[in-house]
Amino acid sequence: MKKGTLVSVVLLLAAVSLGYAQEPGPGGLHGSVDVTYLSKYVWRGFDIYNDKSAIQPSVNLDLGGGVGASVMGHRANSSGYEDGERWDYYLHYSNAINPGEKNAVNYRIGYVYYNYPDMSSSIADLQELHAILSFPNILPVKGLVPTYVLVKLWPSESGSMVGCKSPAGGTASGFAHIFMLDYGIPVQGMGTGSPEQVINLHSEVVFNDGVGPNGANVDQDWSNAVFGISTTFDLGGNFSLTPGVYHQVTMDKSVNPDNDETWASVSATYKF
């Protein structure tokens, strides 16, 4: 019943979004509807579905004034992982300081509620606050952008099984620090009516402050580094397709005992 309600919310948001998209006035609602397939789902170093593929539907809304909201689901394509299905409810505010200047800062402040619909909210649900700071012009190489992300995660309820009294001896409460470097390389467009597209090179390294989202006993250490490449193909009619390949170097066995991970993804997106 709980799962059905959540799916209904996503479908309703998608229907409303597409309804607005029929006549997208300058002041109307804007955003995107997206479905992503992943050959495996790795989240902040953790292999969530034990090397199984996953599907991620989402609806993203631009509410204006820098405010945005989204709903994203995560579900394994194999049976046996129903308890690991997760829905993320995300509200955020984005803006910029000194745009166009060398010391420009693009920032986002966000709140996420992580809900596991097949489990009680008192067992596994999580909440998160994060701040994202990007510096688009600080480096002399055009398109090379460093980003820092500060994450604070905590159990939705104080008596949660993933809280400070987790049977596994760990906690889902604490901080993570993520350092990213992205490089966009413009190339001749390969999509419909697109004269140019961008090859995106992504890298990140994560310092985990001892946070296990499932209450696992996780070390306070540099946990993992990720390297990836992706690009977006313009299919016309506001549709696009984004394939990507990623590789994780695991530095902390308490986060991922399977050593390194490699996976692919493909996203189909409609913007309105």
Task: Describe each PLM feature range.
Residues 22-77, 263:
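Short glycine/proline- and aromatic-enriched beta-strand/turn motifs that initiate or cap beta-hairpins
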Residues 27-29, 51-55, 83-87, 105, ...:
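Residues that define the transmembrane beta-barrel architecture of outer-membrane proteins
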Residues 126-218, 222-225, 247, 270:
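Detector for outer-membrane/organellar transmembrane beta-barrel domains
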Residues 50-109, 113, 138-140, 144-146, ...:
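Glycine- and aromatic-enriched membrane insertion/assembly motifs of diderm outer-membrane
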Residues 1-30:
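Cleavable N-terminal export/targeting peptides
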Residues 38-44, 72-80, 96-100, 112-120, ...:
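Sequence/structural signature of outer-membrane beta-barrel proteins
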Residues 22-30, 66, 96-106, 121-122, ...:
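Short loop/turn motifs that connect adjacent beta-strands in outer-membrane beta-barrel proteins
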Residues 35-37, 57-63, 89-95, 111, ...:
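Residues on the lipid-exposed face of transmembrane beta-strands in outer-membrane beta-barrel proteins
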